[in-house]
Amino acid sequence: MNHCGTKTLETERLILRKFRLDDAGDMFRNWASNPNVTKFLIWQPYTNVDDVKAYIQSCIDCYEKADYYNWVIEYKENDQAIGNISVVELKEHTLCTVIGYCIGEGYWHKGITSEAFSKVIEFLFEEVGVNRIESTHDVNNPNSGRVMAKCGLKYEGTLRQSDWNNQGICDAAHYSILRHEFTGK
């Protein structure tokens, strides 16, 4: 892989960029403190902005690593940080990345997550040189699967009781897209 770190990416409505400490208020307000947002995630809702700042600082500290990819999703319409998308796992030997994402409840069902994910897919295939991009979701969160399908990922199957989140042990639906499916070559 040609690791190049978290570069700023832009779409029609979004700027995907590195976290900044001044994103803490938006992050807390727009997604990180909302139990509806974190319901199917592995981290509990944040209860104060100071803990959000500590998380953001940990991200900032990792940005010097060329193989660290973690973007805040900034909505151009209001210049607010409204979610995040990241590579949660790198599988160097198979040129594979696993993507995770979350977005504030006020921004659900607007195509924002799929817009961000599509841009990250393009970046990972074209600049980083991955061969496979994976993502999974709790089967009780079908909207996440719709995002994956909209971005061109193919459903590969469900592994029963193979994952966990804030709901406990869960069935995980697995999706992926391969480089040749993205490029058509």
Please annotate each region the language model reported.
Residues 1-26, 30-35, 57, 70-185:
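Acyl-donor (CoA/ACP) binding surface of acyl/acetyltransferases
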Residues 43-44, 65, 95:
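Short, surface-exposed helix-loop/turn micro-motifs enriched in polar/charged residues
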Residues 31-32, 41, 63-64:
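Hydrophobic residues in alpha-helical segments
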Residues 38-58:
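Conserved GNAT-fold acetyl-CoA-binding loop/helix
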Residues 48-50, 63, 167:
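A short hydrophobic/aromatic micro-motif that marks alpha-helical segments and, especially, helix-coil
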Residues 62-66, 153:
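Short loop/turn motifs at secondary-structure junctions and domain boundaries
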